[in-house]
Amino acid sequence: MAEPLTGDDLRGGWTRARTMLLDLIPQRFRRDRPVVPVVRLTGVIGLSTPLRGGLSMAGIARTLDRVFGMRNAAAVALAINSPGGSPAQSHLIFRRIRELAQEKNRRVIAFIEDAAASGGYMLACAADEIVADPNSVVGSIGVVGGSFGFDKLIAKIGIERRLYASGEHKAMLDPFLPEDPSDVERLKKLQREIHDDFIALVKARRADKLNGADETLFSGEYWTGRRALGLGLVDAIGDLRSTLRERYGDKVFTPLVSADRGLLGRRVFGVSRDELMPGGLAGDMISALETRALWARYGL
């Protein structure tokens, strides 16, 4: 009669079985390799549409949760390619990355591709280390807003503007009304507040790394990655693959974790939900032009 199995026998059998199973897994998927998941933060920051790929807190939150929830991750890499966009959305994404990094005790490394400008640079500041290509566009730490004035045009062609509003400033900066200097001053005050918050964030994250006068660093100017290194806006010149292989070894596994578009973002019969909405396509075309203009500001 066979002797009953002991706890040591069971543990030994499990170890051998586990080893055999691991041998069947391709090398690139084994957990014994260092793992650094990569999150792409690409496009104009704000609400996304079918023709305007962009970034928003709603669109990236679940992806960030998944990445920082990977127990075997040695670090988290952010691949950033953004000319900026909404200050609020930029800050929301920044805060979520910092909160998750602290909760999960994860080091975050940002890799700048074409650009990390304005809100895109705010995202980069969520990292513990920023690496840029020598030709990346970096900086543009400022706030910008713009509009058009159509009041003279509609008067010339005989169109009368009729606007009904409750609240003294509800129609502030209406493009079909003559520009009011007091409205412009209110807008500039709002922009100064947002700019001050942006400056405080950069100073808090970069601390003693910054190497330049405030008048230079926070003027809204942007620089190449190489020049940004001298100003202390980035920590190193390099690229994602080479840097991670140097830090974590040639066998480092860098899975790209894509954002989940969700049910409402999926396409039905080749058409997305947004495109089915009245005026959706026209709005997307305008958004696409605005996106193109924002990239063009940096020569991209």
Question: What are these model-derived regions, one by one?
Answer:
Residues 1-133, 144-300:
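N-terminal organellar transit peptides
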